[in-house]
Design a protein with these regions (language model features):
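N-terminal ligand-binding/catalytic initiation module
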Residues: 5-254, 260-267, 271-272
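A generic secondary-structure micro-motif detector
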Residues: 164, 282-283
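Short alpha-helical segments and helix-capping/turn motifs at coil-helix boundaries
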Residues: 171-176, 192-195, 288-291, 354-361
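Structural alpha-beta junctions
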Residues: 180-185, 300-301, 367
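General beta-strand structural signal in soluble alpha/beta enzymes
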Residues: 186-191, 209, 282, 305-306, ...
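Catalytic or ion-translocation cores adjacent to nucleophile or general acid/base/metal-coordination motifs
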Residues: 237-260, 264, 271, 276-279, ...
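Active-site/ligand-binding-proximal alpha/beta "capping" segment
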Residues: 347-375, 379
Length: 382
């Protein structure tokens, strides 16, 4: 029987229509499969093959990764993926995984994505034999929460490639092991792959993690793309693969201090004054760069931030990092002038290119007092 192919809207574009914050039900009741949330976590890989899932366009998806594998390497990538499953499923999963590899550039195993909502639940809702293991599960769910993660269904939290796991099988196995482990065990995870539970003691770490550890001679961009496509390494960024992402809040203080010091150095603002009446132009409203907007408001400035990704801009606005969001340059210019004249502390988001914004400022004879950029460009070749 032919399964429905995974398809995208157009080439590589996605519908970003989604309410970022939605009502969550903290439940331990039954899901579609008749299992409770706790039972799902305890079961790990399901005993029956779940139905194939098409790509869900209610969330943003990772861009297609480069095709870097030879035909023999593609076979190896599929073999690496099939090791998580019983042999009776291999004839069904092998062509499906090949399709994901050729269409998406990586095997994510979308079929095994859970039906339950993923978000950081109250800790007592997690099945566990020790509080620290439940805490790790909570942290993983925070990293994969669709209102937080950049590409949640590809298990990427931020930075374009900051992965929690390489595929959904690894997630399911990790949840099962964490649900069952005790304080005399340690879970070892290598680039998303749960190696297993090992005897330890209560004073040892509950989880030992490594991500992307390779020797320098084999650490080029191409080496990474190849090993990632094979399913043998991942880039965890700083806090994605270590399960502790907190978004912009971790850098707001440093960004605020940097902005204040720039004004003191270049605009000769004294140490007792805020940045009232100062116009600060920058770009980037990604997972971390939302800190710029909040820092500008804390410092008392008027900030205009350009962001080409409408989904990222909307998310930062709805989360409260950004004061206002505009799609029209004319309205941005009018609002900025008004805010500067009134000495407001406000961040004004513009969905568009920073070059267009700068050109509009020139055309309207507006000279920014300070300029910066935080478009990190983690995936410059995608």
């Amino acid at each position: 029987r032919k399964e429905k192919h995974l398809t995208r809207n157009g080439n590589s574009s996605y519908s970003f229509r989604r309410k970022i914050f939605f009502d969550r039900v903290h439940y331990s009741g039954e899901t579609k499969m008749g299992l409770t949330f706790k039972q799902h976590l305890l079961n790990g890989i399901p005993s029956e093959l779940p139905p194939l899932k098409p790509l869900d366009n209610s969330v943003p998806h990772a861009p297609t990764r480069p095709q870097v594998l030879s035909e023999s390497e593609k076979k190896l990538a599929i073999q690496n993926s099939l090791r998580y499953f019983p042999a009776k499923w291999h004839s069904t999963l092998a062509p499906e995984f090949l399709q994901e590899l050729e269409e998406l550039g990586h095997i994510y195993m979308h079929r095994f994505r859970p039906d339950y909502d993923i978000f950081a639940r109250p800790i007592h809702e997690y099945p566990s034999n020790c509080l620290s293991a439940a805490s790790v599960m909570l942290m993983i769910h925070n990293n994969l929460d669709p209102s937080i993660a950049q590409f949640p269904h590809e298990l990427i939290t931020y930075g374009g490639n900051g992965s929690v796991f390489q595929n959904w099988a690894q997630y399911l196995i990790a949840m099962e092991l964490l649900s069952k482990m005790n304080e005399s065990q340690t879970l070892v995870v290598n680039s998303g792959h749960p190696l297993g539970l090992f005897p330890s003691n209560p004073d040892s770490p509950r989880v030992v993690i490594s991500n992307g550890l390779v020797i320098p001679n084999y650490s080029s961009q191409l080496d990474y793309e190849r090993m990632n496509a094979l399913g043998v390494t991942q880039f965890g960024q700083m806090t994605a693969g270590s399960y502790m992402y907190i978004g912009p809040q971790g850098i707001v203080h440093g960004t605020t201090i940097t902005l204040l010091n720039a004004a003191r150095k270049y605009l000769e603002i004294n140490n007792e004054s805020n940045l009232s009446g100062i116009l600060f132009i920058t770009s980037g409203l990604g997972g971390m760069s939302g800190a710029q907007a909040k820092a500008a408001v804390i410092a008392g400035a008027v900030c205009i931030i350009a962001e080409v990704d409408s989904h990222a801009a909307v998310k930062r606005h709805q989360q409260g990092w950004l004061s206002e969001l505009h799609y029209d340059l004319h309205s941005v210019i009018l609002r900025a002038r008004e805010a500067v004249n009134n000495g407001e502390a406000v961040s004004i988001g513009y969905v568009g290119n920073i070059v267009d914004l700068l050109e509009a400022l020139i055309e309207n004879n507006i000279t920014p007092d300070l300029g910066s950029d935080q478009t990190s460009l983690h995936n410059p070749w995608l």
